[in-house]
């Protein structure tokens, strides 16, 4: 929705992740992916990916009025497709950029964004949310355990460099934290980053290597 995009750009909304990026939608009686990016200084923007041979001329995006927003609906795409934005500057230079609002990203050394359908995700933390509402975090004691999942513990397996998945680490980490007397966990480097150092390039995508 254009008005919602403008509200976000003017600081009246905090839900940019609902407006920008790649969203699976039902449009014109078919499944499509809606791409949107904010590039106010661009001369033109196009969509590139494994579906068009990374050709900057194949899939141009449409500017939304003079807002600096570029948008495009693409039918026939599936989950797990690689893509980037090809941004043409006013000097004619073409820059290939990952989507800052992507919900998934390619594992290093690749730097592409990845289409992901999050519509079917079901939250199951209602009991915890209810219990949290009955506490006063300002008055309650707090002791934070800061941890990087990739180096906290590893398995003796070659795939994924031995990393635990989120689900595998959840119970062991919770048991350890409770045993040590901590009240909270702060996960380091959980937003996607393309290199071993934590240089975040995508705040909407959690690190892929721990997914499965």
Question: What do these predicted ranges mean?
Answer:
Residues 143, 159-162, 193-212:
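Aromatic- and acidic-residue-enriched carbohydrate-binding clefts of CAZyme catalytic domains
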Residues 171-193:
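Catalytic domains of carbohydrate-active enzymes, especially glycoside hydrolases
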Residues 1-34, 64-146, 151-159, 168, ...:
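The feature marks proteins involved in alpha-glucan
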Residues 57-65:
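Solvent-exposed serine/threonine-rich low-complexity stretches and specific carbohydrate-binding patches
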Residues 37, 85, 147, 177, ...:
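Conserved, mostly hydrophobic/aromatic
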Residues 45-47, 83:
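Short beta-strand elements bearing conserved aromatic residues within extracellular beta-rich modules
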Residues 38-45:
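Short proline/glycine-enriched turn/loop motifs at strand-loop junctions of beta-rich domains
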């Amino acid at each position: 929705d254009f008005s919602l995009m403008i509200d976000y750009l003017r600081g009246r909304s905090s839900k940019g992740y609902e407006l920008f990026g790649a969203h699976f939608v039902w449009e014109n009686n078919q499944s499509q992916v809606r791409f949107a990016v904010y590039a106010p200084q661009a001369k033109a923007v196009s969509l590139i990916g494994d579906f068009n041979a990374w050709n900057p001329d194949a899939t141009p995006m449409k500017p939304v009025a003079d807002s600096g927003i570029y948008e495009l609906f693409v039918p026939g795409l599936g989950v797990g497709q690689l893509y980037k934005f090809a941004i043409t500057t006013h000097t004619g230079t073409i820059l290939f950029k990952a989507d800052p609002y992507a919900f998934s990203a390619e594992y290093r050394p690749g730097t592409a964004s990845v289409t992901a359908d999050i519509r079917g995700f079901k939250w199951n933390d209602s009991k915890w949310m209810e219990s949290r509402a009955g506490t006063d975090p300002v008055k309650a004691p707090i002791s934070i355990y800061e941890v990087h999942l990739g180096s906290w513990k590893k398995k003796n397996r070659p795939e994924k460099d031995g990393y635990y998945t989120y689900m595998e680490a959840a119970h062991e980490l919770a048991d350890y934290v409770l045993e040590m007397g901590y009240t909270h966990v702060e996960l380091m480097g959980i937003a996607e980053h393309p290199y071993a150092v934590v240089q975040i390039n995508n705040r909407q995508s959690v690190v892929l290597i721990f997914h499965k």
